[in-house]
């Protein structure tokens, strides 16, 4: 199913999300079954390939659902992620996955640009989103000039940036992944974390993550 920008924006609105739930009600499940099912569902990407750092077979896997337009996600990227990466990801103890959950069409376009710039290079992708999060205010104005400037810094021509942000196939996949996360994983806001399949909603400090990871590594 092809999703236009306008349709994508409508789905992201509160009314659109309510309609989505109304059209596709979730089954009632017990807590234990729900947790087990969610842990299985969240383990693999749906449409877009995962962007991840750290060994796949690490003892702890953290999956973050984030929106490029949300300040709490930017704060995590700037204040928490560097310490998490240094202590646990780069040392092979944590496998960290970043998944997009755009809260508005601007975030969706910026996510598409990040993937376009990075290609299949996960390391480059994380460098790109770090840069984009630090320029969040300017990017959310979503002017042609601001996107072109980011693209230029990444080595893309203005035409390439325009092609990236109008990539219908990537937008369809982004929309499908967001819908799956909302309907099946109960992701409703960002950031949302899944730590070895256990959901943690809302911002987490490094101290909270450190304590949780430490407890899992001891098991």
Language model region names:
Residues 1-16:
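N-terminal secretory signal peptides and thylakoid transit peptides that target proteins
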Residues 3-7, 35-36, 67, 149-219:
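C-terminal cap of thioredoxin/glutaredoxin-like
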Residues 43-60:
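A short beta-strand-turn-helix
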Residues 66-69, 74-152:
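Structural alpha/beta surface segment adjacent to cysteine/selenocysteine redox centers
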């Amino acid at each position: 199913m092809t999703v236009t920008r306008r349709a994508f924006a409508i789905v992201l609105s509160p009314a659109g999300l309510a309609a989505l739930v109304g059209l596709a009600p979730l089954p009632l499940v017990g807590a234990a079954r729900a947790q087990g099912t969610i842990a299985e569902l969240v383990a693999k990407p749906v449409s877009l390939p995962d962007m991840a750092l750290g060994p796949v077979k690490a003892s702890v896997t953290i999956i973050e659902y984030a929106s490029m337009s949300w300040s709490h996600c930017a704060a995590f990227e700037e204040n928490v992620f560097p310490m998490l990466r240094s202590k646990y990801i780069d040392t092979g103890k944590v496998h960290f996955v970043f998944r997009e959950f755009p809260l508005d069409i601007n975030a969706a376009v910026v996510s598409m640009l990040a993937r376009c710039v990075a290609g299949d290079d996960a390391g480059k992708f994380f460098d790109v989103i770090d840069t984009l999060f630090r320029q969040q205010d300017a990017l959310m104005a979503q002017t042609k000039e601001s996107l072109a400037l980011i693209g230029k810094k990444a080595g893309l021509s203005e035409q390439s940036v325009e092609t990236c942000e109008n990539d219908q196939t990537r937008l369809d996949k982004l929309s499908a992944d967001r819908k799956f996360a909302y309907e099946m994983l109960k992701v409703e806001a960002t950031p949302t974390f899944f730590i070895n399949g256990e959901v943690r909603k809302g911002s987490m400090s490094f101290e909270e993550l450190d304590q949780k990871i430490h407890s899992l590594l001891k098991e």
